[in-house]
């Protein structure tokens, strides 16, 4: 992962990957068909690790607003050089050119939307959230908002701190989910 996040997958040589993995280039090519394959499998491995950690953390938090805040904190980049987000950016750049990459990425994003949907459903059930018209639409829209905030952060605009992007995301969530935040006539 370090090589990819340091220079980008297009700048990394297979020999460099093999050297870091203590393998030959032939061995790397035996397991991976291309550098893109290495990128996607690295991202999938990291997302699997992060999903387990996120779900364990969220399970320990009481209160749906606190869970949502923590979810947002897990989603957004820690810094403008967040290695996982760099992997996502590398993969996103390939998605418009490959339906296979797009489907692969959709499968990686699904657990995020599922976790968000579970928080929203729990919040509605507890009366802490106003029910959105459709939870799936809300999760798609909210994850898109988080992606946009993440991109702003990754552009290395230092005036846009992590605390500020989390605050902006929570404000958007409150605007849609907080009781009294919406008209009663839909």
Language model region names:
Residues 67, 80-103:
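Amphipathic alpha-helical segments used for helix-helix packing
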Residues 102-106, 110, 124-173, 180-186:
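Hydrophobic/aromatic-rich alpha-helical bundle segments in the mid-to-C-terminal region
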Residues 6-10, 61, 126:
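Short coil/turn segments at alpha/beta junctions that flank glycine-rich nucleotide-binding fingerprints
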Residues 33-37, 41, 59-63, 79-80, ...:
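Residues in soluble alpha-helical coiled-coils and helical-bundle/repeat scaffolds
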Residues 41, 52-85, 135-142, 166:
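Hydrophobic alpha-helical connector segments
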Residues 2-37, 41:
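Helix-turn-helix
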């Amino acid at each position: 992962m370090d090589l990819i996040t340091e220079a980008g997958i297009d700048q990394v040589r297979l020999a460099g990957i093999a050297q870091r993995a203590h393998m030959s280039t032939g061995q790397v090519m035996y397991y991976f068909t291309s550098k893109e394959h290495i990128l996607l499998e690295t991202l999938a491995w990291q997302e699997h690790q992060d999903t387990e950690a996120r779900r364990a953390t969220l399970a320990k938090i009481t209160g749906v607003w606190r869970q949502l805040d923590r979810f947002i904190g897990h989603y957004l980049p820690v810094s403008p050089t967040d290695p996982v987000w760099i992997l996502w950016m590398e993969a996103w750049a390939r998605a418009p050119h490959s339906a296979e990459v797009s489907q692969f990425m959709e499968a990686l994003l699904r657990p995020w939307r599922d976790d968000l949907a579970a928080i929203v459903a729990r919040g509605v059930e507890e009366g802490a959230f106003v029910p959105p018209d459709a939870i799936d639409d809300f999760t798609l829209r909210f994850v898109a908002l988080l992606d946009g905030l993440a991109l702003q952060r990754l552009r290395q605009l230092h005036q846009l701190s992590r605390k500020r992007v989390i605050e902006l995301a929570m404000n958007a969530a409150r605007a849609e989910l907080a009781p009294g935040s919406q008209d009663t006539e839909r």
